[in-house]
């Protein structure tokens, strides 16, 4: 599906079922009762819609509004929607609660990603089949099921060493 095929007045969430931040935005949209269409970020969608909408970046999630605006970054998406949909706010009313809420979000968005990525990527014996199938399903959903996992190889290779790089993990550290 390309952006020119969006004839109605819906929100479109471009992302992946295995993206933590896509899940965050999807959960918010469900919580608020905001109708949306979820579009899997396949290679074609990245090339035809996401990259042009984000100045060449291959990032998800991206939310396309009914007015045709594209918003990237889960926090910015939620902030924009919160200002437009004020019922059932996710922002607590009191200042102390807002501080605690912001700290929880910071913890979840910035710090819990490290152990999540560690357990996703550093246990290949247990996770590799799932990873290849999940990325293959996202990137190459129209391929025959028997070979769809092959579509997951490139994204898996791209992400595989990111957790180690960010955490400063190397072979010497792992041997101790």
Roles of regions detected by a PLM:
Residues 145-164, 168:
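A conserved mid-domain beta-alpha-beta active-site/ligand-binding segment of alpha/beta enzyme cores
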Residues 2-144:
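GST-like domain detector, emphasizing the conserved glutathione-binding G-site
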Residues 166-176:
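Loop-centered beta-sheet repeat module
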């Amino acid at each position: 599906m390309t952006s020119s095929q969006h004839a109605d007045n819906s929100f479109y969430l471009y992302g992946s079922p295995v993206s933590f931040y896509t899940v965050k935005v999807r959960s918010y949209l469900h919580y608020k009762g905001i109708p949306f269409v979820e579009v899997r970020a396949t290679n074609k969608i990245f090339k035809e819609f996401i990259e042009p909408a984000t100045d060449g970046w291959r990032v998800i999630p991206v939310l396309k509004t009914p007015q045709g605006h594209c918003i990237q970054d889960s926090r910015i998406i939620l902030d924009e929607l919160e200002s437009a949909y004020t019922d059932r706010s996710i922002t607590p009313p009191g200042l102390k609660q807002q501080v605690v809420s912001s700290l929880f979000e910071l913890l979840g968005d910035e710090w819990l990603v490290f152990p999540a990525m560690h357990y996703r990527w550093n246990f290949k014996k247990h996770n590799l089949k799932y990873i290849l199938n999940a990325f293959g399903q996202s990137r190459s959903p129209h391929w025959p099921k028997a070979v769809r996992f092959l579509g997951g190889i490139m994204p898996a290779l791209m992400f595989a060493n990111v957790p180690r790089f960010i955490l400063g993990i190397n072979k010497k550290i792992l041997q101790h």
